[in-house]
Regions:
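Post-transcriptional modification and biogenesis factors for structured RNAs
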Residues: 1-168
Length: 168
């Protein structure tokens, strides 16, 4: 099973680095749609991703049209504070694409309007001062919901202590 994370028009390098680390740790593919508000060799981006960059399967696209053209037939789910469906109420199929917009504006409303049944939101309090979650946190919530539904394929689900055994 393959999970695809799509980031559209990113603005903050640290978020991208954190998301890249999440993708590396979960085996998810990362798709980045330009333009971006920073360069991919940005020092802050590299630091946030630590030494996980070699574990990434990452593809860049010039714009949304380029992305959709190269991923025709994909099963897309659009995360947005404007959506009417809760992210955990959706059943995510194999090879799903979970799509996130830029930090300041989210995804284009035309895209959301044209795909109402594929738009999902992470529940939050009803307070206009709490506009949204941090992008990297939202991606992590989305990724782990999909992986939970899939039974955490190929992920370690039990840890080990360094000084003790759990059975002692």
């Amino acid at each position: 099973m393959q999970l695809n994370i799509v980031l559209v028009e990113l603005e903050i390098p640290q978020n991208t680095g954190n998301i890249a680390r999440t993708c590396a740790a979960t085996g998810s593919r990362l798709h980045i749609v330009k333009p971006m508000g920073f360069t991919i060799d940005d020092r802050k981006l590299k630091r946030a991703g630590l030494d996980y960059w070699h574990l990434l399967d990452i593809t860049y696209y010039e714009n949304l049209a380029d992305f959709f053209e190269k991923n025709a037939g994909g099963k897309f789910f659009y995360f947005s504070t404007k959506a009417e469906h809760i992210h955990s109420d959706v059943v995510y199929p194999n090879n799903a694409y979970i799509v996130f917009g830029k930090e300041t504006k989210g995804l284009p409303e035309e895209l959301l309007h044209d795909n109402p049944d594929r738009c999902v939101r992470i529940p939050m309090i009803n307070n206009s001062d709490a506009r949204s979650l941090n992008l990297s946190n939202s991606v992590a919530v989305g990724v782990y919901e999909v992986l939970r539904q899939w039974g955490y394929p190929e992920l370690l689900t039990k840890g080990k202590l360094t000084k003790f055994d759990w059975d002692e």
